[in-house]
């Protein structure tokens, strides 16, 4: 039996490996006693896992004659906590083979009258860290002081308090075990504190709640349908519930144990090492807006943390090369098409820097087209650089404005549709196509526009166009670096 754990934000590879393993096991002669399940860590993962486990255990009982034992709702914590003096740090950096780097520059890309914030952040890399265009830079962020203070206040603790953690029976590898650490550092660097509460967390909160009416309310929140509407869609965290239900007497160590490890956030690198191998830049859209709960403001953990960093500040980071072959062609004469609205332009800035260096070295460049989209002139990030690249013959820039006064709403796929002959000609000549950005709406719309363009230019049907696009993907002529936020 196979259950796949994935993240739909990585749309192009979601559940690929679990499906492959399941198919290979069957082909090699293994007997599938229960259907494969799928879990999305950016969705109702726990609910999906619970449903799969119910059917899997029922199938296992039939296949192997097993018996199930129900666990008690109120589990005893496997963590023990002792207040001590001293200082420690999170071991998460080791698990990702991360390095300490420093911020070299942090500047705003949006115009002064824009209601958005996008930061251009340059990071001075350690001597042993290398990267190439198209790579991702992973950042281990710090939780906001506001959320850390909320936790400390709820449990009546001080950030300067020092503790030593020990654990038994359950994995706690993300926590700094066996050495002193301040509660402030522990909560800042080790755990996710503003994720939507899981059903398991809600059940535990209910088990520790001494007020019967409040306990019933919490139990009802984990019910099917109610959980999705009241918790998941509103991003209600375990901390939010603890503040609302003061009769919950959950010990701090149990609360800490139930929190998930702090996850790294990945950003497409927006620079080229051919310009400066010791500097890597990222382009960060700062996430701020009304909370889905209807109360207060929601702030993205990493984007707001990075937005506040200043030159000289430390950042814990690592480099990852995506498996999608999102790199420039080896032959600089190969024509390329780049589609990157908003912060999706990030990796293409690195591509264009590399092409500029190649041209300076005397290399002949194939034609390059960049399709960039934004709301209006105020959101046109890297405008001066892109216009200079175009003047220097590095790229042809095609811009789509979705909210420009006096102009119809236009997205990148609309501009591409108007240039069907040019696009299909480039791809027919062996050109490369790259798409970066939103994978839930933009990327599918771009693919639909490309298929219609192929049908129009070559006079084929819908199926032939679909096969053509699949062929481009299968041969690496079309690669994506996309995400699909909830």
What would you call each of these model-derived segments?
Residues 1-486:
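FNR-like FAD-binding dehydrogenase module
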């Amino acid at each position: 039996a196979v259950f796949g754990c994935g993240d739909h934000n990585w749309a192009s590879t979601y559940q690929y490996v679990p499906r492959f393993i399941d198919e290979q096991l069957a082909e090699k002669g293994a007997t599938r006693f229960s259907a494969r399940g799928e879990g999305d860590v950016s969705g109702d993962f726990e609910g999906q896992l619970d449903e799969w486990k119910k059917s899997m255990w029922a199938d296992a009982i039939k296949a192997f004659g097993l018996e199930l034992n129900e666990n008690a709702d109120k589990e005893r914590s496997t963590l023990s906590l002792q207040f001590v003096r001293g200082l420690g740090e999170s071991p998460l950096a080791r698990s990702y083979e991360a390095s300490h780097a420093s911020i070299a520059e942090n500047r705003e890309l949006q115009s002064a009258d824009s209601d958005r914030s996008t930061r251009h952040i340059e990071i001075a890399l350690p001597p042993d860290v290398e990267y190439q265009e198209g790579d991702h830079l992973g950042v281990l962020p710090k939780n906001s002081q506001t959320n850390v203070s909320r936790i400390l206040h709820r449990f009546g603790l001080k950030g300067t308090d020092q503790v030593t953690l020990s654990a038994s029976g359950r994995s706690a590898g993300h926590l700094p075990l066996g050495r002193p650490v301040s509660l402030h550092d522990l909560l800042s660097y080790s755990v996710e504190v503003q994720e939507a509460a899981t059903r398991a967390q809600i059940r535990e909160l209910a088990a520790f709640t001494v007020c019967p009416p409040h306990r019933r309310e919490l139990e009802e929140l984990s019910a099917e349908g109610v959980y999705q509407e009241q918790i998941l869609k509103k991003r209600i965290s375990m901390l939010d519930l603890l503040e609302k239900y003061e009769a919950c007497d959950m010990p701090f160590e149990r609360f800490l144990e139930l929190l998930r490890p702090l996850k790294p956030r990945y950003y497409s690198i927006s620079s080229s090492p051919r310009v400066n191998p010791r500097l890597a830049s990222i382009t960060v859209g700062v996430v701020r807006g009304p909370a889905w709960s209807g109360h207060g403001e929601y702030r993205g953990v990493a984007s707001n943390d990075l937005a506040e960093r200043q030159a000289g500040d430390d950042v814990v980071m690592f480099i990852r090369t995506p498996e999608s072959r999102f790199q420039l062609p080896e032959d600089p004469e190969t024509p390329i098409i780049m589609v990157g609205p908003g912060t999706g332009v990030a990796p293409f800035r690195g591509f264009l820097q590399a092409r500029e260096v190649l041209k300076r070295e005397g290399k002949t460049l194939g034609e390059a087209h960049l399709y960039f989209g934004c709301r209006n002139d105020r959101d046109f990030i890297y405008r001066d650089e892109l216009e200079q690249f175009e003047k220097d013959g590095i790229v042809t820039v095609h811009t789509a404005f979705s909210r420009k006064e006096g102009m119809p709403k236009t997205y990148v796929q609309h501009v591409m549709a108007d240039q069907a002959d040019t696009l299909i000609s480039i791809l027919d000549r062996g050109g490369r196509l790259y798409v970066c950005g939103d994978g839930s709406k933009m990327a599918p719309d771009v693919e639909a526009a490309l298929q219609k363009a192929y049908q129009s230019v070559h006079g084929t049907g819908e199926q032939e166009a679909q096969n053509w696009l699949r062929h481009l993907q299968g041969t690496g002529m079309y690669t994506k670096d996309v995400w699909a936020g909830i």
